[in-house]
Swiss-Prot record:
Any Pfam family matching the protein: Ferrochelatase
SUPFAM superfamilies membership: Chelatase
UniProt-listed Enzyme Commission number(s): 4.98.1.1
GO biological process: heme biosynthetic process
UniProt-annotated binding residues for Fe cation: 210, 291
Protein location: Cytoplasm
Pathway recorded for this protein: Porphyrin-containing compound metabolism; protoheme biosynthesis; protoheme from protoporphyrin-IX: step 1/1
Function statement: Catalyzes the ferrous insertion into protoporphyrin IX.
Gene: hemH
Protein name, UniProt field: Ferrochelatase
Gene source species: Thioalkalivibrio sulfidiphilus (strain HL-EbGR7)
HAMAP family according to UniProt: Ferrochelatase
Amino acid sequence: MRFDGESDYRHGSPEILGVLVTNLGTPDAPTPKALRRYLKEFLWDPRVVEIPRAAWWLILNGIILNVRPRRSAKLYEQVWTEEGSPLLVIGRRQAEGVATRLSERLPGPVKVELAMRYGQPSIESGLMRLREAGARRILVLPLYPQYSGSTGGSTFDQVSRVLRRWRWVPGLRFVSDYHSDAGYLDALAESVRAYWDQHGRGSKLLMSFHGVPKRYLLAGDPYHCQCHATGRQLAERLGLKEGEWVVTFQSRFGKAEWLKPYTDMTVKALGEEKLGRLDVVCPGFSADCLETIEEIAGENREIFQHAGGGEFHYIPALNDNPDHLDALADLVLRNVQGWPEANPGYDATARQSAAEASRARALGMGAKD
């Protein structure tokens, strides 16, 4: 293996703290071609689909990639904006908001980059930009509040895959999850209360999380438990009683059993009960995307009302809500403690002088630059 070095490195170069904020990803455009490229990368990840590779290759390339891209492109067309994919647009705002807050609160220099596990901007490009900026310490923050091997685990895999090719590996920290983080839960609760203050309140709050195959739970994945922990703590903050809220799981794919109860079936059952109003929030989605805008606010609304239900209210994801950005910045600050840039005594002038002295010594010993 050839390792990727830094041929343009200069002794005494200033060092900074890097933060890589990541999310799942998005196609480059709402077209079958772009969707095929995106889905191939996504669905070929062994963390996402744990099926023997040879059999899955035949299914993926022989069936799914010949059918699903056209169907998915039509769905993406419905949520695409003039700025682009909602997930990417919101992700940029989130990264900018976190960067602003960290610059105000960290004693030392920091740079925040956004990256996607699948598609662009890639994790590799994000890490490269941080390295080029002088980041010798990097915190990776996947915006998945609840950990699953298929999301956070896959992100760690890709970060490792990139860094294993670097000659000079940076200091690295990784936020596995934040499902019980007080700032995150408080931001969620406040967003629900704010929505209720403006639009009134239904008799039941449905908390829909992205689903995963049940066999992942049985194999030891903590995702199911963490979703329920988030749901319970959110309900407590909202003062909800038993029967006034329910946790469900959406977006199942294929014929295998996934985590239950299923969102669409629960929504249909509540509609058949002639529920007058249903409120839905998706605590596991840090930003609105296809799964919340089209699947929940669109498809599940139709299911509920077609079954006989009344009003259907989707409460938006936290997105770039200031409380959310504050919570994410706090999360970063706690996880970078002990690094120089987080030291209250950080002295930029002293560090620059030390760097210049180090450079002078290196040049004196024969270094070329």
